[in-house]
Amino acid sequence: MDRPFKVLGIQQVAIGGESKQKLSKFWVDVMGLTKVSDYRSEKENVDEDILSMGHGPFKVEIDLMEPVDPTKSPKVHDPKLNHIGLWIDDLAKAVEWLTKQGVRFTPGGIRKGAAGYDVCFIHPKGNEEFPLSSEGVLVELVQAPADVIKALS
């Protein structure tokens, strides 16, 4: 199948839990990852710590997420593996092409993500209009910057 974009690699893995503090004990204290920033959004019901491993274009984020309000949606702590982020060389072309193939996206379209890159999300479940999905896994498509495109192409 000829597609007008490439998936270059993994940008992030987002892990949800009831407590970022408990998640940090494992990922920072035990595994040795470094916290590089944080992000909070009442609208997205998320309070997250952004960790990293690797360097330069090979850096991968591990996002530790807890809900701002566990009674509201989205429930960023359930499932525990919240989503996976993929570097894309041309996000706009990818969204256009995938939509034509019948892939369902979450509301909101392309927007700035927590790490400052343009992102959009493939819905974990299809529907009648857009039957293709990632079968239960939320997938974030992330516009790769030039250095990542060069290194991973």
Residue ranges and their predicted role:
Residues 1-24, 81-88, 142-153:
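N-terminal beta-strand motif that seeds the catalytic metal site of vicinal oxygen chelate
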